[in-house]
């Protein structure tokens, strides 16, 4: 879901901290080509200071750490950050618990800001000027996502229908390949310089795909434990009927780079 004008799940509350264990286990699934979108643009590499907003369990900084950048990562959920710290042992990554909109960090202190799988959650009227102030002049804001394609992949479509059965207000359904929408308020502070969208097959087992779906906002982050258990039983049965033990799910990757305007 990339349209920031959509009211997420019709206002239904969600908390990814409720699903941190599954999130950590089943959502570190991005292929190498996902991270290459950054390095091919000379982003998040040696000598750069990077801020990852909406970091979740730290998937992006952990996987990009090998390229030599200095990472700071923030998330609103203390549970997600605790899991990120656990998974990042031995890595020099600074983690902070804060809403992105309320970040208190030195102005001009970052060469890159990344927003992976989270951009649509922000209050953009606040984050657009905030991101500009945190970046050095001419630095980059990189926004990324990877979504399954329910109309092109039978297994993804069937799993998505089951999520909607239990969470009909969930607005994460119905993805098609499209550029990430950047709200107009960013144009005062940034210029879009590059974007890319392409399809990719991501490998799963029945267990890992069930875990990926269970950790989505419409299930693990918003349903009660009893509802999650009921959904999972039905989903496991569904997969036993429609999916082999190992299979690929068709996704698309979208990436956009914005340059901070020099004022």
Describe these PLM feature segments.
Residues 2-45:
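Conserved class I S-adenosyl-L-methionine
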Residues 51, 57-102:
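Class I SAM-dependent methyltransferase SAM/SAH-binding core
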Residues 103-112:
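A short acidic, Gly/Pro-enriched loop at the edge of an enzyme's catalytic core
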Residues 112-116, 124:
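A short beta-strand submotif of the Rossmann-like class I SAM-dependent methyltransferase core
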Residues 122-131:
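A short, conserved alpha-helix within the catalytic core of class I
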Residues 125, 180-263:
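Conserved Class I S-adenosyl-L-methionine
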Residues 132, 137-202:
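Conserved catalytic/acceptor-binding region of the Class I
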């Amino acid at each position: 879901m990339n349209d920031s004008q959509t009211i997420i799940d019709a206002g239904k509350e969600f908390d990814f901290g409720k699903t941190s264990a599954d999130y950590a286990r089943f959502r570190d699934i991005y292929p190498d080509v996902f991270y290459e979108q950054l390095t091919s643009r000379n982003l998040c590499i040696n000598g750069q200071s990077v801020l990852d907003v909406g970091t979740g369990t730290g998937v992006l900084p952990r996987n990009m750490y090998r390229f030599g950048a200095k990472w700071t990562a923030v998330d609103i959920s203390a549970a997600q950050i605790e899991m990120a710290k656990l998974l990042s042992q031995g890595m020099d990554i600074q983690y902070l618990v804060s809403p992105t909109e309320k970040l208190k960090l030195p102005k001009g202190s970052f060469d890159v800001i990344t927003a992976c799988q989270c951009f649509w959650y922000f209050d953009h009227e606040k984050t657009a000027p905030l991101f500009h102030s945190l970046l050095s002049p001419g630095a980059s804001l990189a926004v990324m996502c990877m979504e399954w394609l329910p109309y092109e992949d039978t297994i993804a479509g069937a799993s998505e229908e089951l999520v909607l059965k239990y969470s009909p207000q969930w607005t994460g359904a119905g993805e098609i390949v499209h550029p990430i929408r950047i709200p107009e308020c960013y144009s005062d502070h940034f210029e879009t310089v590059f974007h890319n969208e392409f399809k990719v097959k991501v490998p799963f087992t029945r267990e890992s795909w069930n875990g990926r779906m269970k950790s989505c906002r419409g299930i693990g982050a918003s349903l009660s434990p009893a509802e999650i258990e009921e959904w999972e039983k039905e989903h496991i049965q569904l997969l036993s009927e429609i999916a082999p033990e190992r299979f690929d799910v068709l996704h698309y990757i979208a990436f956009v780079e914005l340059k901070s305007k020099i004022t």
